[in-house]
């Protein structure tokens, strides 16, 4: 027993000492690019156990004068999978969701850090589960690799998912520190869309939603959100690696932001989280949060690990979001 206690004390100390200091973050501008006209109905998930939905309080959306409200419910389902431990489901209802996108299913993954805790077998299991979940679109939040040699095998496997509306991703701090060009080139080679301060318009039956992505959010040169040029009438999803960006930078016209980076703390025991990859402490640690303008933000625990290949109390996860028209 004493050995176990000493081990976790040592682990917390190592993680705390090795924690990188948080940096200020930001974002530049963009134009709608791609149009897609049809999308088939999504099939229900068969292989995950059911869980009771947890009702979240009603929240507000855009930081403009007339602020529409959103209604959000969440449920968590554990899975028997070598890549992730659970799927976190959100039903996201908002007035700006077009009727044609009722039931639109978004899969969101982040921080694979391949190969860290996530190895080849786990990656294949993860992809099998993503295929089974049948998302209409796959969004990715960056920090993909732990070495340039892992870039091609990672995206080659992820490309097997083939969601009807495509695969979109932003890059994380690891990806700007190394392998940036390899990652962008490989993603594009496999038909994926890299959103470095770009937006893309998804169309269905004459209606649209917009996906916006942030270039290196730790670079102060990127302090203008790509959402600022968009219409407040559109439903806009902002994809960014770190949740701090949504608080530090004006992200007007954003209806929902998605982020990773925190790993959910990666190691959490008895309420103690020795590593917090955010200047805001536990405020944006994991799950549903809001910036000061009450813009909803979903932060995922991610999948892989950094510094040490261990997760305690912060399960690796896929986030699934289903959009609904709030009337």
Q: Where do the protein language model's features map onto the residues?
A:
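Membrane-embedded segments
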Residues: 83-85, 97-185, 190-193
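Beta-strand-turn-beta hairpins that frame and shape the catalytic cleft
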Residues: 85, 94-107, 192-193, 200-212, ...
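Active-site neighborhood of phospho(di)ester-bond hydrolases with catalytic His/Asp-centered motifs
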Residues: 109-110, 137-143, 166-173, 195-198, ...
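Conserved beta-sheet core of the metallophosphoesterase superfamily
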Residues: 159, 243-322, 326-327
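Short beta-strand/loop segments at the ligand-binding rim of alpha/beta enzyme cores
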Residues: 228-238
């Amino acid at each position: 027993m004493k050995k176990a206690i000493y081990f976790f004390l040592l682990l917390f100390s190592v993680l705390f000492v090795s924690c990188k200091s948080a940096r200020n973050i930001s974002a530049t501008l963009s134009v709608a690019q791609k149009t897609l006209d049809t999308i088939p109905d999504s099939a229900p998930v068969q292989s995950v156990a059911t869980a009771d939905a947890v009702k979240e309080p009603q929240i507000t959306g855009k930081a403009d004068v007339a602020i529409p409200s959103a209604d959000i419910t969440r449920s968590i389902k554990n899975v028997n999978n070598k890549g992730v431990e659970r799927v976190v489901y959100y039903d996201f209802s908002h007035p700006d969701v077009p009727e044609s996108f009722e039931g639109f299913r978004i899969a969101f993954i982040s921080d694979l850090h391949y190969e860290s805790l996530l190895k080849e077998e786990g990656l294949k299991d993860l992809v099998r589960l993503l295929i089974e979940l049948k998302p209409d679109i796959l969004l990715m939040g960056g920090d993909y690799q732990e070495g340039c040699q892992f870039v091609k095998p990672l995206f080659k496997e992820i490309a097997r998912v083939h969601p009807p509306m495509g695969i979109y991703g932003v890059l994380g701090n690891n990806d700007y520190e190394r392998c940036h060009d390899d990652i962008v080139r490989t993603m594009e080679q496999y038909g994926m869309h890299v959103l470095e301060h770009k937006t893309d318009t998804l169309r269905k039956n004459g209606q649209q939603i917009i996906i916006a992505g942030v270039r290196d959010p730790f670079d102060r040169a990127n302090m203008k959100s790509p959402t600022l040029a968009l219409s407040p009438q559109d439903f806009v999803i902002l994809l960014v690696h770190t949740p701090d960006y949504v608080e530090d930078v004006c992200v007007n016209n954003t209806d929902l932001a998605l982020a990773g980076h925190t790993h959910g703390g990666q190691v959490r025991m008895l309420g103690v989280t020795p590593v917090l990859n955010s200047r805001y402490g536990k405020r944006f640690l994991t799950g549903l949060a809001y910036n000061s303008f009450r813009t909803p933000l979903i932060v995922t625990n991610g999948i892989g690990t950094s510094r040490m290949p261990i997760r305690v109390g912060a399960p690796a996860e896929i986030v699934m979001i289903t959009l609904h028209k709030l009337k």
